[in-house]
């Protein structure tokens, strides 16, 4: 009876997650596009539902909600379904929609879709060869084979996003990095933009006048008399077309310049708004957060370097370790086990909420940046693939943030994976991503004033 009640709770929560994923799909991703394939919407919503269910089961594990055997069953079932979606269903449909957009392959799209899926499976399987991700006990058809490979891709994505976010967040929030933009700078750039637009209009007028003159001459000398008249008309039209071609090239160059000037003007306006915003109370609060995140970024890079150099992986969760150090230093009586459980629950909850929110914001921006009416179905499926792999690998990494007694069932469900490898791999990719982001933002920040000062 308790299993039925537990299952009804899980099914209800999955329906709610599915509905939220459906609404997000309709209201955010596809609000400007026509939905042609409902299977894409269903796959995205199902992936989102089962991804969120894994985080829900982590919270249930800490709070002790549901029976232990029920949690284990739903962990196992949830993991099997999400792997089925990520390894078999989504890659096949991505190949199917890619082939469907190619007219030459339209009649045999099912065959070519299967070939693309088999190609994906080959490279997906070969991905595990260079990495020590599995125990030798596992067979070739075990579920751990799939989890381990999905985990490598997902952890790589997480580390790349985390490394960039750890650097970009303080750069975005701190007023220290803002350029000093005045109204004079904006007016000067706007004047250049207007001058460029005037030049484009005048040259287009010249082109229109030249075409009109050529058309009128063509009507007057419509039927040239004799051989020399024909030669004259041909040479006149050739020289006129050459002039038009040269003017058109000048117009194209000026239009490209006007686009760049417009983007620079918009950037100056955005920077000026950020300067005004930084003077408000909320702006000062985010500026303080920027300093806090910059300290966190330096600490995270330092710890990642230490972990890589000394091949170190923590045995206890960070909360318990931090409380133990504080209690021993102050020499006070404190129930470390009791409070570490509650603080770990809050920490894991914050990690889960920020992970879901941050990923959804990133997916929305990414979708609008590269999507079109033809490619939107393929891109949504790619986003579903990234989202699923991201959440599966989040479970692998969040496991280390939980006290030891709560890790048992997750370890049993995920199998005997080499968990230490994933943490070391995360540190390596995080460090590379963070240092690359620092270099990129430094060069971008250095070039911005030079652009502004350019005549």
From Swiss-Prot:
It is a multi-pass membrane protein. GO terms for biological process: intracellular pH reduction; positive regulation of canonical NF-kappaB signal transduction; protein transport; T cell differentiation. It is found in: Golgi apparatus membrane. Glycans are attached at residues 180, 243. GO terms for cellular component: Golgi cisterna membrane; Golgi membrane; Golgi-associated vesicle membrane; monoatomic ion channel complex. The chain crosses the membrane at residues 5-25, 46-66, 79-99, 114-134, 150-170, 290-310, 343-363, 378-398, 425-445. Pfam families: ABA_GPCR, GPHR_N. Disulfide bonds: none annotated. GO terms for molecular function: voltage-gated monoatomic anion channel activity. Keywords: Glycoprotein, Golgi apparatus, Ion channel, Ion transport, Membrane, Protein transport, Transmembrane, Transmembrane helix, Transport, Voltage-gated channel. Ubiquitous. It catalyses: iodide(out) = iodide(in); chloride(in) = chloride(out); bromide(in) = bromide(out); fluoride(in) = fluoride(out). Voltage-gated channel that enables the transfer of monoatomic anions such as iodide, chloride, bromide and fluoride which may function in counter-ion conductance and participates in Golgi acidification. Plays a role in lymphocyte development, probably by acting as a RABL3 effector in hematopoietic cells. Does not seem to be able to bind GTP. Belongs to the Golgi pH regulator (TC 1.A.38) family. PANTHER family: G-PROTEIN COUPLED RECEPTOR 89-RELATED, GOLGI PH REGULATOR A-RELATED. Homotrimer. Interacts with RABL3; the interaction stabilizes GPR89A. This is Golgi pH regulator A. It comes from Homo sapiens. The gene is GPR89A.
